[in-house]
Amino acid sequence: MPFGIDNTDFTVLAGLVLAVLLYVKRNSIKELLMSDDGDITAVSSGNRDIAQVVTENNKNYLVLYASQTGTAEDYAKKFSKELVAKFNLNVMCADVENYDFESLNDVPVIVSIFISTYGEGDFPDGAVNFEDFICNAEAGALSNLRYNMFGLGNSTYEFFNGAAKKAEKHLSAAGAIRLGKLGEADDGAGTTDEDYMAWKDSILEVLKDELHLDEQEAKFTSQFQYTVLNEITDSMSLGEPSAHYLPSHQLNRNADGIQLGPFDLSQPYIAPIVKSRELFSSNDRNCIHSEFDLSGSNIKYSTGDHLAVWPSNPLEKVEQFLSIFNLDPETIFDLKPLDPTVKVPFPTPTTIGAAIKHYLEITGPVSRQLFSSLIQFAPNADVKEKLTLLSKDKDQFAVEITSKYFNIADALKYLSDGAKWDTVPMQFLVESVPQMTPRYYSISSSSLSEKQTVHVTSIVENFPNPELPDAPPVVGVTTNLLRNIQLAQNNVNIAETNLPVHYDLNGPRKLFANYKLPVHVRRSNFRLPSNPSTPVIMIGPGTGVAPFRGFIRERVAFLESQKKGGNNVSLGKHILFYGSRNTDDFLYQDEWPEYAKKLDGSFEMVVAHSRLPNTKKVYVQDKLKDYEDQVFEMINNGAFIYVCGDAKGMAKGVSTALVGILSRGKSITTDEATELIKMLKTSGRYQEDVW
């Protein structure tokens, strides 16, 4: 076997990989089956037969999505709305998680499939049944199916759009007929929206021919009945993350008062932040360490998992959004689906202010697709002409909108010179503005040493607008929320600080009072080898060090427990390549020497500083080359390699450096070394947690 791993070790490793995969999938299925949220089911009748639902609801087009973080769902819904607006089609848009597909060959309409790739070429967790069905479909079993497909992936990963390509391969083998080209969005290149627009334009031309469609001027038709109500009741949402937290509901707890899950995208846990501190502060950057207490729930996590943190929008951005659309935040409204295959996107009834603060993603970049949809609501002819031009010209859109980091309100105020967009219906905003999604952070604690506490390490995004020096700074929604909490928790008067944005820290009905936020744990395959004697190479600059702090704390706790039990355990070599700009932003600087002492010399840390005064820039990939002999020996002795951090630059640079190390160490070509790196990734010995 290659790289010093014998047959027994390889068998154990393969079993481990399979076990982790099964655990992740099993957990998703278990969570789906255990959920008691009635809004999760897309069809009110509970019918899971996809062909029957399409037929019974008189649909003439089907859009399916398999989404891990909500992006595929967002684009599927955009596409569905355009089919309705331009061609008056009766479209069903559905999550594959909610249906069975044995009758897929009997679906009498064309199907569009939007599918995200998760991890190492995997299908999203909710697509277990869909993946199983298409991968086991026999030749000719889907010969009646006509479909098109759009994949969402990241080219910095080894298996770029792997799920979409796998789905397309198996659908084709089963006889399904693909219409048009396979679309591939590349988040790694930052071109997801433009990739979608190019694919969508080509597919619409195909559909015009296939279905003999006549395009009409886009006209918004809501999927919901919108009703204004008069009074607030206990059953009305004021921004609660799910209906479970309304006063009219009772949370599910055991005899000890522990809140029971499952906790996931549909129902997060409201976790107290018991401690937060600033790791460093400079003129342009801050880093916050936050500790979330999970002891009031039955949530379990493993070292290497991610914590999903649900933010609310900053008060300044909420006010800006309300102003440009001339909306009254106190207006109470309800939404009722006009179609049984459609679900309400968030708890209603609610107020306009609550929806905008808690449920809609109002601070993100605006898309050309949204501009195209907004043309019908332009406040005057000049603005309509501008919108039309920008929605069709991606280069001009990039110059005027994207490069300036405009959100929706910024862009519309810029285009209309401050004129209100007061003819835009609230239903349009609900259906066109993306839903708020959680932000995922690599957990920086160990489940062995902090069993019921999760640590998160976050750089606060806050920088001047590069194109508009007089504009407000560009800010990250969740990281600035964590900074607001850190200051308040440490008795700093926020009113006296120069913060770029502020938040309602109490939340709906004071649900978030005393520093709480909605969270859930997302399982990861980013795991230490089960054999403690296995060598480990960790590479993580900046906040990419977060999971490795968890890894090392795990090894410290393990070694201490073994010593207490009288066991003499020998740890394999653990080396961490860490990078920071300078000594001022060296994360957890005081902790690492203590870990080295406790691990009896089995832990070594190598630091690269990229911005020390009067010195050459040094990055982690440079340090890998400096330690080439040691790195090669460790890999040859079966080391596991872990990389965490920036996908575009660092992760590629690290991969290139390791290819060079293997090429020189084994006296093989670069291509051969590249194939060896691919083998390591496939076997689970080279793992990445990158963004």
From Swiss-Prot:
Keywords, sorted A to Z: Cell membrane, Endoplasmic reticulum, FAD, Flavoprotein, FMN, Isopeptide bond, Lipid biosynthesis, Lipid metabolism, Membrane, Mitochondrion, Mitochondrion outer membrane, NADP, Oxidoreductase, Phosphoprotein, Steroid biosynthesis, Steroid metabolism, Sterol biosynthesis, Sterol metabolism, Transmembrane, Transmembrane helix, Ubl conjugation
Superkingdom of origin: Eukaryota
Name of the gene: NCP1
Catalytic reaction list: 2 oxidized [cytochrome P450] + NADPH = 2 reduced [cytochrome P450] + NADP(+) + H(+)
Record topology, Cytoplasmic segments: 25-691
Ubl conjugation found in the keyword field: yes
Miscellaneous comment: Present with 46600 molecules/cell in log phase SD medium.
Cofactor note: Binds 1 FAD per monomer.
Disulfide bonds: none
Subunit structure as annotated in this protein's UniProt entry: Interacts with PCL1.
Residue ranges crossing the lipid bilayer per the database entry: 8-24
Membrane topology: Single-pass membrane protein
Record PTM: Phosphorylated by the cyclin-CDK PCL1-PHO85.
Classification via Pfam families: FAD_binding_1, Flavodoxin_1, NAD_binding_1
Record's protein name: NADPH--cytochrome P450 reductase
Disruption phenotype: Accumulates 20% of ergosterol of wild type.
Named cofactor requirement(s): FAD; FMN
Functional summary from the UniProt entry: This enzyme is required for electron transfer from NADP to cytochrome P450 in microsomes. It can also provide electron transfer to heme oxygenase and cytochrome B5. Involved in ergosterol biosynthesis. Has NADPH-dependent ferrireductase activity on the plasma membrane.
Induction, as annotated: By galactose and on the plasma membrane by iron or copper deficiency. Repressed by glucose.
Single GO molecular function: electron transfer activity
Similarity comment: Belongs to the NADPH--cytochrome P450 reductase family.
Cell compartment(s), UniProt: Endoplasmic reticulum membrane; Mitochondrion outer membrane; Cell membrane
Chain sites annotated for binding FMN: 67-72, 78, 116-119, 152-161, 187
